[in-house]
Amino acid sequence: MPTINQLIRQPRVSARVKSKSPALENSPQKRGVCTRVYTTTPKKPNSALRKVAKVRLTNGFEVISYIGGEGHNLQEHSVVLLRGGRVKDLPGVRYHMVRGALDTQGVKDRKQARSKYGTKRAKAGKK
């Protein structure tokens, strides 16, 4: 236990909080260009083909980003918008694509949670 004089000379230093999405550099989103679009398999016990893309950001970082929703139109050289948010069963994937922004289209025929997938509201059908 330090004395009060020791604390006056050298105060306690609080631990620095480490960012979970360092490539965003404290921005809410960042723009980037897809360098590779591919599928990968999740960790045990899950099984799927998850759609991901390697993206070079405007600040020079190269990160792996998850493409949410059913179906996508992305290919190499597509310009995309990234947000933070990891995918628990994909190691190294710490970013999500923002659907419906820049070159990324929204999810087709989406009815619920549309804002998360960049889908416009459908026209009211006949009853």
From Swiss-Prot:
HAMAP family in alphabetical order? Ribosomal_uS12_B (MF_00403_B)
In terms of CDD domains, this protein maps to:
Ribosomal_S12
Protein name, entry field? Small ribosomal subunit protein uS12
Give an example GO cellular component term for this record. small ribosomal subunit
Report the GO molecular function annotations: rRNA binding; structural constituent of ribosome; tRNA binding
Region Disordered: start-end pairs = 104-127
**Gene that encodes the chain:** rpsL
Q: Which family does it belong to?
A: Belongs to the universal ribosomal protein uS12 family.
What is the organism field in this record? Herminiimonas arsenicoxydans
